[in-house]
Amino acid sequence: MFARQTLRAAQPFRSQYRRYATESSSSGSNTALYTGVAAAVAGAGYYFMSQGDNAAKVKDAAKDAEAKAKEALGQGQAKVEGAVGKAAFTGGDQGFISLKLDSVELVNHNTKKFRFELPESDQVSGLHVTSALITKYKGPEMQKPAIRPYTPTSDEGEKGFIDLLVKKYPNGVMSEHMHEMVPGQRLDFKGPIPKYAWSANKHDHIALIAGGTGITPMYQLARAIFNNPADKTKVTLVFANVTEEDILLKREFEDLENTYPQRFRAFYVLDNPPKSWKGGKGFINKELLKTVLPEPKSENIKLFVCGPPGMYKAISGGKVSPSDQGELAGILKELGYSKDQVYKF
């Protein structure tokens, strides 16, 4: 796979990057439930016809079939609700919820993985794909609380906890506070904060252009796509970091690459690579993006960008506000992409 190969000259490989084979479709359903309901109704219909003018028996059979159908549908609905679970975060006027820190795992020299317990063990977070949570912390000498958004890396269907990957930034009030936290302490959360509404096969091909911890919503989206057998979206990841050690979730992306080599490809770029590095060097540039991204004239594509301010400026231009995507600028505009083909997290 190309993500482990040297980035060679762009042109000879362009056609290779553009090609993806189609995989067979498979998806789960409630077939057994609906078949049972249909059988009950069909059986009653047959009984009606076979009994002629026996009105009392026909009426009793109809009631029995209706009751069985309702019971089957009720059981199916309960099964679905049980699988989804109760939501810890419901948005609206819910306000902040205090969550207890369960565990802390050192990921690299400046990043930790934090697992917070949800209020109840059978609850799910309530987040949808590409949504985030707001954290709040007010220290004893702080006049105003620090408010920061984070995208959980735990699966939306996981019950009882959420996971966050947090990089410690110099003078970053929230990240410094979290890196000092120990299990048993608490932090306030609120959400969910919706971003880009995703549904299976919404786009034929998407590209994820990320820098640093901007990878978290990208991972959330890629995981949802490949966890859904019905979703056949093709995914290209371009991920920039300072050093190889800074590449977060690389093992998870390598697993996707190994499992779906015809639908998922990853390209890594390092500002300070080791001598043995065979990937991209420096910054994400126009030549690389022109080579690996779906062409601007392609139908039904979407490009997602998430990273530090300097990356936004160079790649796509920044957002005006959380609700205003702003105009498209930078390399993506130069390559001919339109504003509606790009989403900035």
Curated annotation (Swiss-Prot):
Its main location: mitochondrion. GO terms for biological process: ergosterol biosynthetic process. It is found in: Mitochondrion outer membrane. It is a single-pass membrane protein. Residues 94-199 form the FAD-binding FR-type domain. It holds the Pfam family NAD_binding_1. PANTHER family: NADH-CYTOCHROME B5 REDUCTASE (PTHR19370), NADH-CYTOCHROME B5 REDUCTASE 2 (PTHR19370:SF171). This is NADH-cytochrome b5 reductase 2. It comes from Sclerotinia sclerotiorum (strain ATCC 18683 / 1980 / Ss-1). The lineage of its organism: Eukaryota, Fungi, Dikarya, Ascomycota, Pezizomycotina.
